[in-house]
């Protein structure tokens, strides 16, 4: 099973709590995280894009770096780990993104991939005069399909004459073309998003569900397989989880309870308000799950809380879900979290025996 790190491009990572570590996003922080991830044989690093935060007393995600320029810098200071940036497709024409991707492909020597997002938080785009109107909620994947068609034209042939509703290319050129096949990923979870990923994406990210319920996302993975089968394609599922680990279950649980107790209610109220703006996409979107009050303090991503050994066991359970190729990880404290994963969790995982062969051999002897 492949492992990636969802790096903290925004302040405070993914915990909306005054009791969680408080920090600003910097290149140096993310360089340290990704270099440590590479040292421990993580397979990839992904950064999101966020153009406006949630506010509140923690100023959650009010401070963000930009994804492409950050990942270009990280590509230059790594050598093996794959690097994924995120394109906010309402803000950048596909021909520009195609050229930027080709540039980072050159910097990384073929290690670059692209995550594409349609945009769900209206104020991010409205503040710049770039929101196309609320009808966009119902048509955003039509827009994204045309966008990816243009990208693949330009990466594949260096030229596009694509004519669609949203984009019209006229002998558009991009050269040099990327040296490696640039993988396109999406995080579609609604029916429309899943249909898009089934037709156009190489991988699809989905949210894990619940606390210490590592296989609860299985129905989402099954939906993806059905959608991909209908297109005659194979699209791997990658699932998002947060790890909160310590020497004992009790110590890890105490941290989790503290984070929940310090939840930034003002920032969470903003998230809930924004999640209600999309009345077109149904109840199964990522943002609706993020705003669910059950575990909103970490936007309801799947959460693994426990001792290093128990987290390793739950990670192996994730690997048993059909169609699951990898896990995208966040941590309550990223630098310590990546180190502990590499030193204390990964060596215990049967699903990572390929990167820890000596540890796997010792388990078999025992």
Curated annotation (Swiss-Prot):
The keyword Oxidoreductase applies. Keywords: Flavoprotein, FMN, Monooxygenase, NADP, Oxidoreductase. GO terms for biological process: alkanesulfonate catabolic process; nitrogen utilization; uracil catabolic process. CDD domains: Alkanesulfonate_monoxygenase (cd01094). It holds the Pfam family Bac_luciferase. The keyword Nucleotide-binding does not apply. GO terms for molecular function: alkanesulfonate monooxygenase activity; uracil oxygenase activity. Its EC number is 1.14.99.46. It catalyses: uracil + FMNH2 + NADH + O2 = (Z)-3-ureidoacrylate + FMN + NAD(+) + H2O + H(+); thymine + FMNH2 + NADH + O2 = (Z)-2-methylureidoacrylate + FMN + NAD(+) + H2O + H(+). InterPro entries: Luciferase-like_dom, Luciferase-like_sf, Pyrimidine_monooxygenase_RutA, SsuD_RutA_monooxygenase. FMN binds at residues 49-50, 115, 124, 140-141, 190. The FMN-N(5)-oxide reacts spontaneously with NADH to produce FMN. Requires the flavin reductase RutF to regenerate FMN in vivo. Belongs to the NtaA/SnaA/DszA monooxygenase family. RutA subfamily. This is Pyrimidine monooxygenase RutA. It comes from Serratia proteamaculans (strain 568). The lineage of its organism: Bacteria, Pseudomonadati, Pseudomonadota, Gammaproteobacteria, Enterobacterales.
